[in-house]
Amino acid sequence: MDTRVELELEPVGKQDRLKDQPDDENEPLENQLELEQEHKSLLTPVKIPPAQTASPDQEATPSTPPPMSLQPGTSRQLFRDAAMAHGGQETTSLLQQELNNIAATQTPASKLRSASSTLDASISRNPSTTGGKHEKKLGHRRVAEGGEVTYKKIQSKQIMGSIQLGIQHTVGSLASKPKRDLLMNDFWEMETISFPPDGSSITPAHHYNDFRFKVYAPIAFRYFRDLFGIAPDDFLMSMCASPLRELSNPGASGSIFYLTTDDEFIIKTVQKKECEFLQKLLPGYYMNLSQNPRTLLPKFFGLYCFHYNSKNVRLVAMNNLLPSDIKMHCKYDLKGSSFRRKASKAERQKASPTFKDLDFAEHHPNGIFLETDKYNALMSTIKRDCMVLESFQIMDYSLLVGIHNLDLAAKEKREERILNARAKLQRKESAAQGPPSLNPDDDAPEADQNQLQAVASYASIPGTSAGAALNRTRSMNRQRLVAHSTALESITADMDVPLEEDEDVPAGGIPARSENDERLILYIGIIDILQSYRLEKKLEHTFKSILYNGDTVSVCRPSFYAKRFQDAMGKQVFKKTPTFPLKHSPSKRKTSTTQLRSPASRLPPLSTPTNAVRQPIMTMSGMSTPPPAFDDISEEDITAASTSSLQQQRSSNQSNNNRGETEVALREGNNTRGGSGEPSSTYHTQYSYDSSGRTGSALTSDYSDDESTGTDLSSRLPKLRTHRLTKTSVQVTTVGYVEGVDTPPKGGQDVVHADVNGKTTMTTTTMLTTTKTAHIQAPSYTSTLVLNDLPR
């Protein structure tokens, strides 16, 4: 009895369990039939038995998938054939059929459903299977299939037009208010204006949806614009006169960039945390700009918020670092770190990629060379800006470097000119092969060939290109709206350097050289300064320091980041141009620049009586005052010296010959009267320094180390010297000297000499003459120095 009850109860429980089982097992088959019907036109006809419907008789038996009429491997072959017939694309139905056939005999139904759902999800994310409707998303920025850009699901065109309306209203209304001193409350002031489509008493009508526009610290930003010399009318003309241009290359955070038509300002979307941090930064930012407006930090001119459809889009207006009318051959985002600081493959494939620190080390292993004054000005500016950022606890900023290669640009223009000339020649040759014209010109192809050769030869000259004069005129006449906005203005105040007439050099950049001696123009600035060292960044640094080297990651404490940033910029990125300074002579006295640049004043007239006897002249044609420093010698002086030396060569040679004859005659006369001695002639070279501009005390201090035999320099009589000086950059090195023979005079001699003023004086003295002849050798000449030491 009990056994019967158990037998009667078992089917009841079994039926309850089997009522739900057929539906679950038949669900994959139903999905398969639906998918096959959808793609019926794309599939090869395959005979598949219809799905069996569940019946009460079948419920009692264990449910198994219906056997397929396909032989093992037949479905796989059909799958390949269908895939090849459709260009090798794996359709959804074929994938589903293959998966069901394999999993029906090997996996349970629950695992089959999970695998099919995963496949559907993966295929739905594939743009090739969804008809290309997949959107590219980076942050809040999305790009649809047709190229339409949205930010927070708001069209970019609506954002652009709305902020132009808001800026036009706020700046215009603020211009009517009188100017006053900036107060602390002005940094926290906010103003909100509603813009209905039909307009209001203070806002114009527009074709956009209803939105609100918020302005942060309008009076404070007006002060910043005045500090950089931006008039309200000019700011409105730049922002609102024409539609803004959207940059196609967004930042790493997915921000949207708008550029004004005149290339002066750029508007960037920022996050809420960055907007709040900039508000807190405004008082310190104001203090820094008041003390030093020449900085590489971003120059902010406005902070706004666009509110539409319960979403806020925050934007900041600032100066544009990279002019769009100048081609940037390379762009670098440098932080001084090395961990994952290499551009990705997707970034490298862009038309204008932005490289990073490791890429810069590969492209410029020895860095970029700057002149000494430019290097010092740049590094002092970076040091000061890093100190300001460190005081605000800011890190993770970077230096944006845009490089314009002048030599490469000239080469590209030359190639373009040659291609244009060849295309013109080909067109004329093809026209000549056609029907003859009324006035045929047989010399036209030859003339075009000559023109092509002329273009090639003209283009080979450095600094010449098509439109160079026009571009140069634009660069020289174009006055930037924002003061101190260019890279050169940001680091130095010397902006009065004229451009060369034969060079097409863009204005505003910093001149530099590569290790291959290529001419470069740099456009630099510090960006991304709205990242503070908050708790999130501290945790990121701690986590990365555990896994990797903490000194190489980008995120670190502000003090260490500033030091690492300065070291990388000053030692790896930028370097001084290697120079070879001239070695000075042993003189301790430095000749003033005024004396060096007035050689005409060094030739006072000499008046000597005709019958007077002159004593031997102490000629110092080899030793001189120290050569001036490299910076003291201007190009005009060197050019003037080189040209005047050719004109004075004949006259100087004649005068030197006359002087030599006179000196020999005088010395022979002295030897006849007072004693015997060997006559010594003085040789003057064209390239020599003379110490005629110095006094006797200077000579005593300069040459006090020279040897003398029984002489006292303090008892020397006034001597006459040849007043000659020709500037040169040749380094003179003393090799040695030959000491002469002491010749005592037989008696006293009367010496008639003339001073500088022309007065004659006769002095009787007993002299012991010691002649020292020093041979001075230089790379390009050899001169002789004669010194006469007098006894006490």
From Swiss-Prot:
Interacts with ash2 (via B30.2/SPRY domain); the interaction is direct and seems to be specific for ash2 isoform B. This is Phosphatidylinositol 4-phosphate 5-kinase type-1 sktl. It is a peripheral membrane protein. GO terms for cellular component: apical plasma membrane; cell cortex; chromosome; male germline ring canal; motile cilium; nucleus; plasma membrane. It is found in: Cytoplasm; Cytoplasm, Cell cortex; Nucleus; Chromosome. Residues 155-573 form the PIPK domain. It comes from Drosophila melanogaster. GO terms for biological process: apical constriction; basement membrane organization; cortical actin cytoskeleton organization; dorsal appendage formation; endosome organization; epithelial to mesenchymal transition; establishment or maintenance of cell polarity regulating cell shape; follicle cell of egg chamber development. It holds the Pfam family PIP5K. Catalyzes the phosphorylation of phosphatidylinositol 4-phosphate (PtdIns[4]P) to form phosphatidylinositol 4,5-bisphosphate (PtdIns[4,5]P(2)), a lipid second messenger that regulates several cellular processes such as signal transduction, vesicle trafficking, actin cytoskeleton dynamics, cell adhesion, and cell motility. PtdIns[4,5]P(2) can directly act as a second messenger or can be utilized as a precursor to generate other second messengers: inositol 1,4,5-trisphosphate (IP3), diacylglycerol (DAG) or phosphatidylinositol-3,4,5-trisphosphate (PtdIns[3,4,5]P(3)). Residues 642-658 have a biased composition (Low complexity). The gene is sktl. Its EC number is 2.7.1.68. Residues 1-74, 105-139, 423-446, 577-612, 640-714 are annotated as: Disordered. SUPFAM superfamilies: SAICAR synthase-like (SSF56104). Disruption phenotype: Late embryonic lethal with no gross morphological defects. Keywords: Cell membrane, Cell projection, Chromosome, Cilium, Cytoplasm, Flagellum, Kinase, Lipid metabolism, Membrane, Nucleus, Phospholipid metabolism, Transferase. The keyword Nucleus applies. Residues 52-62, 105-131, 678-702 have a biased composition (Polar residues). It comes from the Eukaryota. GO terms for molecular function: 1-phosphatidylinositol-4-phosphate 5-kinase activity. Residues 1-21 have a biased composition (Basic and acidic residues). The keyword Transcription does not apply. It catalyses: a 1,2-diacyl-sn-glycero-3-phospho-(1D-myo-inositol 4-phosphate) + ATP = a 1,2-diacyl-sn-glycero-3-phospho-(1D-myo-inositol-4,5-bisphosphate) + ADP + H(+).
